[in-house]
């Protein structure tokens, strides 16, 4: 039996702690392998007083200076030792603790900070290991909200609908850059590199869009042929999704969807000029992630026909005639609203965008619990 835990605390100085603990052959091997590294120490409260259960403290990286060596051998390992001693753990456990070793001037203040941060991180990481935190449900809940501090952007997979998809089909680079500068920060916005835009500037236009917007970008290629090649080109240009034309040969559609799956992209299937969207959808061996419907498919009701069953399996997008005045009604049936000229032709596109997204609910972090406040050691909520 072996369990794992992790914790990171601190601001200017960070304490990064990874823990493996348990009983039996697996942890014994881990313990022995750590000992063979030669740069680890037994966690001790003072020389000749190691803590129980036996705990090895291992640096995450090579120690390259006398300052790092003194901090590791001294205050960092002591903080880990004190955390283990205070937890009063089962003596039969074996504990391996991996720590980073910051290189900071040795001052009383820095030593106190290091002790405080590593003590708390070690204690938290051990408790997390014992309680098998986080749960699978926690990871599933956080995967689309997580924002790693060293990355700076989220990997959006359309898991938090509804979305406003802004179709950018402007004729000049000046127009494009103007629009990109007006887009407000929102988790409900998707940008579409429109077909005319891509034809004029190439898929490299997506890289230009990235300089202003690092959210979800759709390459509206309306793929009709060479599905795999076009998807791969969009992937290399950092698109998050590719739009495939529903009037393409079925083999092209399937190959394009398959390539999207291989590349980790979201596949859109555009049903423009498709007379029987449901029949086409049902006939596909591989299903798209998003189906785009157009107002012309059902002018009378402007909604999903009762016999259509897309909603059970994928996200639905609607294009054509989408306005601020009908957002609430459309969101009853569709998860993505595609808007082009109503925004791009506006004198104040930023204001129009905000009018749309203000009707789409809260952003991801609005009611987010900070510092993992839902974490209750001993009984995870």
Swiss-Prot record:
Gene Ontology biological-process entries: 'de novo' pyrimidine nucleobase biosynthetic process; carbohydrate biosynthetic process; L-ascorbic acid catabolic process
Protein name (Swiss-Prot/TrEMBL): Bifunctional enzyme Fae/Hps
Matching SUPFAM superfamilies: Ribosomal protein S5 domain 2-like (SSF54211), Ribulose-phoshate binding barrel (SSF51366)
UniProt keyword annotation of Lyase present: yes
Organism: Methanocaldococcus jannaschii (strain ATCC 43067 / DSM 2661 / JAL-1 / JCM 10045 / NBRC 100440) (Methanococcus jannaschii)
Domain of life: Archaea
Record region (3-hexulose-6-phosphate synthase): 151-381
Keywords assigned: Carbohydrate metabolism, Lyase, Multifunctional enzyme
EC number per UniProt: 4.2.1.147, 4.1.2.43
Catalytic activity, as annotated: 5,6,7,8-tetrahydromethanopterin + formaldehyde = 5,10-methylenetetrahydromethanopterin + H2O; D-ribulose 5-phosphate + formaldehyde = D-arabino-hex-3-ulose 6-phosphate
Family the entry assigns: In the N-terminal section; belongs to the formaldehyde-activating enzyme family.
Gene: fae-hps
This protein's pathway: Carbohydrate biosynthesis; D-ribose 5-phosphate biosynthesis
SMART domains named in the record: OMPdecase
Cross-referenced Gene3D superfamilies: Aldolase class I, Formaldehyde-activating enzyme
UniProt-listed InterPro entries: Aldolase_TIM (IPR013785), Fae/Hps (IPR020868), HCHO-activating_enzyme (IPR014826), HCHO-activating_enzyme_sf (IPR037075), HPS/KGPDC (IPR041710), OMPdeCOase_dom (IPR001754), Ribosomal_Su5_D2-typ_SF (IPR020568), RibuloseP-bd_barrel (IPR011060)
Chain segments carrying region Formaldehyde-activating enzyme: 1-150
Molecular function per GO: 3-dehydro-L-gulonate-6-phosphate decarboxylase activity; carbon-nitrogen lyase activity; hexulose-6-phosphate synthase activity; hydro-lyase activity; orotidine-5'-phosphate decarboxylase activity
The protein's role, per its UniProt record: Catalyzes the condensation of formaldehyde with tetrahydromethanopterin (H(4)MPT) to 5,10-methylenetetrahydromethanopterin. Catalyzes the reversible formation of ribulose-5-phosphate and formaldehyde from 3-hexulose-6-phosphate.
